[in-house]
Amino acid sequence: MAPLTEVGAFLGGLEGLGQQVGSHFLLPPAGERPPLLGERRGALERGARGGPGSVELAHLHGILRRRQLYCRTGFHLQILPDGSVQGTRQDHSLFGILEFISVAVGLVSIRGVDSGLYLGMNGKGELYGSEKLTSECIFREQFEENWYNTYSSNIYKHGDTGRRYFVALNKDGTPRDGARSKRHQKFTHFLPRPVDPERVPELYKDLLVYTG
């Protein structure tokens, strides 16, 4: 199923939310108060309280972009068809071409183009590939001062400190325990890199139109 078809009316069905168009939102009818960012995020988190990770966000509106996700440890994150997540040093690996779907300001889901699986993180801080878009597949995208990004779970954090679980890759390319990873560590620092369609034409055959 196409990601933007699968990502549909969950946010649209939440009361008071405007309609997202590109990177902007249409204003609600005159007289209605536009939603605040905290309310939009809060609605996503409330949707997960019925059982973290089990709530399927099958109708989430979003804007899609394709990138590679390069970690400061020297690896591109990839999602394999068997549901495992690991790093690869190969540039433009098929399993390392990812679709970033913006579901709210600062919130994204990440889907492997070739595997068709969404990046997820469970309550133990373990990364995995999910066939369905659930609340465990929503991450907070934070732009850091060193020009890298961090991605943290939208629902899992330490109860005592409030520190969130972070997506991270070890120095050998294996996924790092998100519960033990911290924002300032290079394991958690990622750089979204552009994708050259000519390097992976098989992933763009339905999008590209060739003219002779």
From Swiss-Prot:
<dbReference type="GO" id="GO:0042491">
    <property type="term" value="P:inner ear auditory receptor cell differentiation"/>
</dbReference>
<dbReference type="GO" id="GO:0005104">
    <property type="term" value="F:fibroblast growth factor receptor binding"/>
</dbReference>
<dbReference type="GO" id="GO:0008083">
    <property type="term" value="F:growth factor activity"/>
</dbReference>
<comment type="subunit">
    <text>Homodimer. Interacts with FGFR2 and FGFR4. Affinity between fibroblast growth factors (FGFs) and their receptors is increased by heparan sulfate glycosaminoglycans that function as coreceptors.</text>
</comment>
<protein>
    <recommendedName>
        <fullName>Fibroblast growth factor 20</fullName>
    </recommendedName>
</protein>
<keyword id="KW-0964">Secreted</keyword>
<dbReference type="GO" id="GO:0043524">
    <property type="term" value="P:negative regulation of neuron apoptotic process"/>
</dbReference>
<dbReference type="GO" id="GO:0008284">
    <property type="term" value="P:positive regulation of cell population proliferation"/>
</dbReference>
<dbReference type="InterPro" id="IPR002209">
    <property type="entry name" value="Fibroblast_GF_fam"/>
</dbReference>
<dbReference type="GO" id="GO:0005615">
    <property type="term" value="C:extracellular space"/>
</dbReference>
<dbReference type="GO" id="GO:0045664">
    <property type="term" value="P:regulation of neuron differentiation"/>
</dbReference>
<dbReference type="GO" id="GO:0090722">
    <property type="term" value="F:receptor-receptor interaction"/>
</dbReference>
<dbReference type="GO" id="GO:0022008">
    <property type="term" value="P:neurogenesis"/>
</dbReference>
<dbReference type="GO" id="GO:0030334">
    <property type="term" value="P:regulation of cell migration"/>
</dbReference>
<keyword id="KW-0339">Growth factor</keyword>
<dbReference type="GO" id="GO:0008543">
    <property type="term" value="P:fibroblast growth factor receptor signaling pathway"/>
</dbReference>
<dbReference type="GO" id="GO:0070374">
    <property type="term" value="P:positive regulation of ERK1 and ERK2 cascade"/>
</dbReference>
<comment type="similarity">
    <text>Belongs to the heparin-binding growth factors family.</text>
</comment>
<dbReference type="GO" id="GO:0030154">
    <property type="term" value="P:cell differentiation"/>
</dbReference>
<dbReference type="GO" id="GO:0005737">
    <property type="term" value="C:cytoplasm"/>
</dbReference>
<dbReference type="InterPro" id="IPR008996">
    <property type="entry name" value="IL1/FGF"/>
</dbReference>
<dbReference type="Pfam" id="PF00167">
    <property type="entry name" value="FGF"/>
</dbReference>
<dbReference type="GO" id="GO:0043410">
    <property type="term" value="P:positive regulation of MAPK cascade"/>
</dbReference>
<comment type="function">
    <text>Neurotrophic factor that regulates central nervous development and function. May play an important role in dopaminergic neurons in the substantia nigra.</text>
</comment>
<dbReference type="GO" id="GO:0060043">
    <property type="term" value="P:regulation of cardiac muscle cell proliferation"/>
</dbReference>
